[in-house]
C-alpha cells in the first residue's frame, strides 16, 4: 500500500535558495524531531550527496522508536536544477509500522522573483496488510504534521542563507 501526502507553501526567497536548502544544507536542522520522530544528528558516507544515484547514511538521536545511531539511508533519485528533487529513504534500522521505504519530492516553481511555490510530497510504502489502516492514519495525521514542521525549518534556513554543505 502507498499512502500519499502533499503539502505546499510559498517561500519569499530566491529560487536557488528554495531549491537547494532542504537537500544540500545540514539535515540535522531540517529534521529536528517531533513526537515519536527522533532528531537527525548527522550523516556519513555523504561525499557525493546531492547528485542523482548517490546516497548517505542518516543517524538519529535516541527516542521511543529508535535506539539512536544509524537510522536509515537517503538516496537522490532525480535532480532537475531549481525545479525538482526526488529522493528515497529506506534501509530503516528500526521497525516503522510496516513501512519499508518513503519516496519524497520537493518541487519549486517561481511565481515571481523571490516568491517561490513549494510542493512537498511523500509516498509512504508499506507491505504488511495488517497495518494498512494504521499506515494510512499515520500518513494523513502525524506525517503530514511532521512535514509542515520540516517546511517551516527549511523556510527559516532559506531566509537565513544557511550554508550549503554539498554541491
Name each region found by the language model.
Residues 29, 41-97, 152-167:
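Glycine-rich portal/gate segments that line the openings of hydrophobic small-molecule binding cavities
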Residues 12-16, 77-84, 107-117, 162-163:
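A short, structured loop/turn motif at beta-sheet edges
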Residues 7-9, 71-78, 102-110, 122:
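Hydrophobic/aromatic beta-strand elements that line small-molecule binding cavities or substrate pockets
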Residues 1-51:
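Hydrophobic ligand-binding cavity/cleft-lining segments
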Residues 123-167:
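A conserved amphipathic terminal alpha-helix motif
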Residues 19, 88, 119-121:
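Beta-strand residues in well-ordered beta-sheet regions across diverse protein folds
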Amino acid at each position: 500500500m502507498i499512502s500519499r501526502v502533499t503539502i505546499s507553501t510559498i517561500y519569499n526567497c530566491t529560487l536557488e535558495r528554495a531549491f537547494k536548502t532542504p537537500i544540500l544544507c545540514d539535515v540535522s536542522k531540517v529534521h529536528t524531531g517531533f513526537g515519536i520522530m527522533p532528531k537527525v544528528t548527522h550523516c556519513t558516507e555523504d561525499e557525493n550527496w546531492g547528485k542523482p544515484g548517490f546516497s548517505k547514511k542518516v543517524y538519529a538521536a535516541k527516542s521511543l522508536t529508535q535506539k539512536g545511531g544509524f537510522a536509515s539511508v537517503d538516496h537522490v533519485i532525480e535532480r532537475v536544477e531549481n525545479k525538482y528533487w526526488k529522493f528515497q529513504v529506506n534501509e530503516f534500522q528500526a521497525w516503522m509500522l510496516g513501512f519499508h521505504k518513503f519516496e519524497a519530492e520537493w518541487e519549486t516553481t517561481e511565481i515571481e522573483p523571490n516568491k517561490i511555490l513549494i510542493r512537498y510530497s511523500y509516498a509512504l510504502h508499506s507491505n504488511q496488510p495488517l497495518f494498512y489502516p494504521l499506515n494510512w492514519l499515520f500518513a494523513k495525521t502525524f506525517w503530514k504534521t511532521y512535514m509542515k514542521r520540516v517546511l517551516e525549518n527549511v523556510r527559516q534556513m532559506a531566509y537565513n542563507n544557511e550554508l550549503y554543505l554539498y554541491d
